[in-house]
């Protein structure tokens, strides 16, 4: 027969909860603390994610989901109305100014419709976008500053820029402007479509021009499905219209782009088991941390109220009903604890986020208010609460009325009696007491150990960030000076006008403090190598369609052996620069010999420094023939007519560049190397070889310095930084510089961010550990009040009792220290091996400093906490304590 007694059970639970006000306060605080942990971490994570996305969008140049590049007008009209597309925007690139004052800024002149302008952060704060049929233009305050024009509507400005190799000078009327954002790589001058077409007609460029992009249609889109699977949707749109983006040589190929700024797109494209495991492990860690404290709170409650639950059995209460009482109390307390934790967690996360983001260069500071934060934190906290009260509920449900009245913690455990010659000591009693409730002891020791392990992992993680490895990836020497265009993305190919004069080097050297330095000579002449057709195709397949490739091979000259002529990249390096190369195979010693006919073949590497051994054809010991071209003629293969320059070839004709006057020089490949990005050309597309600097000048007859790299003393670093900043800004703005100090600052900011995040998490987990330690001691003393009273009644001194409790506390601390040390030593190398695969600049260095600092703190807690708890419990007399239990 089923009795409807739910109302009675709820009343019992409510009244017993009202009688335990202290317990309620502790439980609410425990639940709130767990919710704070979830909410603050979710807030920080979501805020940093949003900030990273905004930062990434600015680096990408916009926040559209993806796009289709270099389209014909027909392809554009075909794709833009696909059902998967929610909104679309169109842009046509026209040209770029590269001369002073734009040599240090990336400025693009183009047409963009309203959607595209908005997605590129080109929303005028004053005025509007340009109207068709006018000479209007809109731009940002940085471009206006470079032009020396005040941001006033109606202002006229004139600018010269390159359009597909042709320089044009145009005058515009300012119709709108927006504030300059230094995080955005490219600045824009937006003009009407009619003016863009007129400029293309003026210079004689037919889209897509010689460069394959000028005047072509670029379609950017916002997808109906959002950012969850951008790449798949882009591919599906192409498939819907008979195109693809995988085989660059195929006639149906269209170049596409996925906005990597969306973390959802990154996860969908790069999701691997290690990422899933890492996220799951972090969530489980947080749940377990919250579980430890809430579980102990309810365990204390059940221990204190054990007689109450036993007596409920005498009036017919079932174990399931008693579990429901505890669960009801937990849910009621959650109604107070979870909202409090949500508010406090969001406020704490909101305060921590700016501190963390301030360490991250370029990340937009913002505090997320996403509903995901609050819903997720509330659900995780609720699950943690329900898990935490299950075992205490089972304990209450299992106890019988007689057992409840006689209950002493651990009293139900039966063990074999050991006979020994030694007497009982306070230490042995303390050890035995810990064994009476092994589950509680394990939970407490684990909780304390978790804090130590987490702190040690955090310190080892941030300590493993190798500044030398990070900085050397971007800057090989303390300072590197070059023409400003050499540091610009999309800048000019190195030429004679970009060379560093000796006078500039002399001015730098005159500052003093330079310990060593050297130059890298750049190629300003025509030079060819001859390669097989297979390598020619492999090296260029990403840039041409199959039809274009076949035509290119038809128009490419061959030598007597039938090998194809191909552009080659050469540089001459002094000893200082050669010292900074990474040797993959062979020996660089022969390149230190002036005049030696030896070269190093340059191989590409990935972000982790792993060489890509298929990025070059040359192998150790190969003979490379370099053809230094002094005079070239341009022959129409169909008519055989030769022209002196490409400009002389009729627009409707093809031509083959054929060397007329040249020198062939043979070199032996002495080494295979990787070049630091800071000393490289910073653009690719041709096989590259490095020569000795004197050999380079002797064989090429040129001496244009591309880079001057040098190191300084620590004392002179600051002065040199200040000098170069002023020199390149005010004295000689044609040149610019990079320094290790800049990248070191970025590195320290990133490391500080991880230290702050890890430190905050370690503090919260450590606080939970200390609270659990306090709870464990409190539970043990409360549950054994009668036992202590009996011991004192038969002659045990209060001092002895306190000593025994101190021993218990020290054993907890010792156990936590031992377990944390073992876990760190066992799992540290394994975990950090995985970290090293994620962060290419990570080098594992074990340090136990956190352990050595925290261990004495735990020992001190092991002494103070038991004494403090015992002092509050022992205020009653022995007789009162005996009567209280009986």
Segments the model singles out, each with a brief description of its role:
Residues 1-26, 300-321, 348-374, 383-455, ...:
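Feature of multi-pass inner-membrane transport and sensor proteins
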Residues 3, 10-18, 24-30, 40-66, ...:
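Cytosol-facing boundaries of transmembrane alpha helices in integral membrane proteins
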Residues 20, 292-333, 769-811:
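Interfacial "coupling" helices/loops that link adjacent transmembrane helices in transporter permeases
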Residues 32-39, 43, 290, 330, ...:
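Small-residue faces within membrane-embedded alpha-helices
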Residues 46-266, 463, 470-758:
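Basic-flanked hydrophobic alpha-helices used for secretion and membrane insertion
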Residues 48, 271, 338, 342-376, ...:
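Short helix-loop junctions at transmembrane helix boundaries
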Residues 269-286, 372, 748-765:
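N-terminal membrane-entry
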Residues 754-768, 779, 788, 822, ...:
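Hydrophobic multi-pass inner-membrane translocation pores used for secretion
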């Amino acid at each position: 027969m089923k009795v409807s007694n739910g109302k009675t059970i709820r009343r019992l639970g409510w009244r017993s909860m009202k009688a335990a006000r202290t317990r309620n306060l502790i439980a609410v605080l425990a639940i709130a603390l767990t919710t704070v942990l979830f909410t603050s971490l979710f807030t920080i994570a979501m805020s940093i994610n949003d900030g990273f996305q905004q930062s990434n969008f600015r680096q990408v140049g916009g926040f559209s989901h993806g796009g289709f590049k270099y389209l014909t007008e027909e392809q554009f009209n075909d794709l833009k109305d696909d059902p998967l597309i929610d909104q679309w925007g169109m842009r046509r690139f026209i040209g770029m100014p590269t001369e002073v004052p734009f040599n240090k800024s990336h400025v693009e002149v183009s047409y963009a419709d309203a959607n595209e302008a908005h997605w590129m952060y080109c929303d005028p704060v004053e005025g509007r976008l340009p109207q068709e049929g006018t000479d209007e233009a809109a731009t940002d305050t940085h471009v206006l500053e470079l032009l020396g024009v005040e941001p006033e509507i109606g202002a006229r400005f004139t600018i010269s820029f390159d359009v597909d190799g042709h320089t044009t000078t145009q005058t515009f009327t300012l119709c709108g402007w927006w504030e300059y954002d230094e995080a955005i790589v490219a600045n824009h001058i937006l003009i009407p479509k009619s003016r863009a077409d007129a400029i293309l007609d003026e210079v004689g460029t037919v889209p897509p021009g010689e460069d394959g992009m000028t005047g072509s249609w670029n379609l950017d889109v916002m997808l109906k499905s959002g950012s969850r699977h951008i790449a798949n949707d882009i591919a599906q749109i192409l498939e819907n219209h008979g195109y693809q983006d995988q085989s660059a040589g195929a006639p149906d190929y269209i170049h596409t782009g996925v906005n990597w700024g969306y973390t959802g797109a990154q996860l969908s494209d790069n999701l691997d088991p290690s990422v899933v495991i890492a996220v799951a492990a972090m969530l489980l860690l947080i749940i377990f941390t919250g579980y430890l404290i809430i579980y102990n709170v309810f365990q204390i409650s059940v221990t204190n109220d054990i007689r109450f639950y036993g007596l409920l059995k005498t009036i017919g209460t079932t174990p399931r009903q008693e579990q429901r009482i505890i669960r009801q109390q937990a849910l009621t307390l959650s109604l107070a604890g979870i909202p409090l934790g949500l508010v406090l967690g969001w406020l704490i996360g909101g305060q921590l986020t700016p501190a963390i983001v301030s360490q991250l260069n370029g990340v937009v500071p913002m505090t997320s208010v996403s509903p995901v934060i609050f819903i997720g934190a509330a659900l995780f906290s609720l699950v943690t609460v329900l898990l935490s009260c299950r075992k205490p509920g089972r304990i209450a449900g299992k106890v019988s009325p007689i057992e409840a009245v006689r209950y002493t913690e651990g009293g139900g455990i039966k063990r074999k009696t050991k006979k020994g010659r030694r007497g009982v000591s306070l230490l042995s009693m303390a050890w035995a007491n810990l064994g009476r409730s092994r589950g509680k002891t394990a939970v407490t020791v684990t909780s304390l150990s978790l804090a130590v392990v987490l702190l040690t992992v955090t310190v080892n993680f941030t300590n493993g960030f190798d500044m030398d490895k990070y900085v050397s990836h971007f800057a090989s020497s303390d300072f590197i000076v070059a023409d400003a265009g050499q540091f610009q993305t999309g800048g000019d190919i190195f030429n004679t006008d970009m060379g560093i004069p000796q006078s500039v080097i002399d001015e730098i050297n005159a500052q003093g403090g330079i310990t060593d330095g050297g130059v890298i000579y750049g190629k300003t002449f025509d030079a060819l190598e001859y390669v097989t057709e297979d390598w020619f195709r492999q090296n260029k397949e990403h840039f041409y369609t199959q039809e274009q490739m076949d035509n290119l091979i038809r128009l490419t000259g061959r030598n007597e052996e039938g090998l194809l002529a191909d552009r080659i990249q050469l540089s001459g390096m002094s000893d200082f620069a050669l010292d900074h190369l990474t040797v993959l195979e062979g020996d660089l010693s022969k390149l230190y010999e002036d005049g030696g006919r030896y070269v190093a073949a340059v191989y590409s590497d990935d972000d982790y420094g792993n060489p890509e051994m298929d990025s070059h054809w040359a192998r150790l010991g190969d003979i490379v023939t370099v053809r230094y071209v002094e005079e070239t003629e341009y022959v129409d293969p169909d008519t055989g007519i030769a022209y002196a320059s490409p400009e002389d070839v009729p627009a409707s004709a093809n031509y083959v560049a054929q060397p007329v006057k040249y020198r062939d020089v043979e070199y032996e490949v002495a080494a295979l190397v990787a070049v630091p990005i800071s000393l490289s050309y910073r653009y690719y597309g041709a096989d590259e070889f490095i020569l000795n600097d004197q050999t380079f000048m002797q064989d090429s007859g040129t001496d244009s310095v591309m880079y001057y790299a040098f190191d300084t003393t620590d004392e002179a670093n600051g002065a040199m930084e200040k000098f170069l900043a002023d020199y390149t800004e005010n004295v000689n703005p044609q040149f610019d510089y990079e320094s290790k100090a800049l990248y070191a600052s970025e590195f320290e900011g990133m490391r500080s961010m991880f230290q702050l995040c890890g430190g905050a998490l370690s503090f919260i987990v450590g606080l939970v550990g200390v609270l659990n330690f306090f709870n464990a001691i409190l539970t043990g003393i409360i549950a054994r009040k009668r036992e202590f009273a009996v011991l004192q009644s038969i002659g045990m001194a209060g001092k002895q009792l306190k000593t025994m409790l101190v021993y218990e506390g020290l054993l907890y601390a010792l156990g936590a220290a031992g377990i944390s040390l073992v876990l760190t030593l066992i799992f540290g190398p394994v975990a950090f091996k995985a970290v090293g695969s994620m962060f290419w600049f990570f080098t594992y260095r074990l340090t136990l400093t956190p352990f050595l600092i925290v261990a004495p703190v735990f020992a001190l807690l092991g002494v103070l906490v038991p004494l403090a708890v015992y002092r509050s419990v022992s205020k009653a007399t022995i007789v009162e304590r005996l009567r209280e239990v009986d």
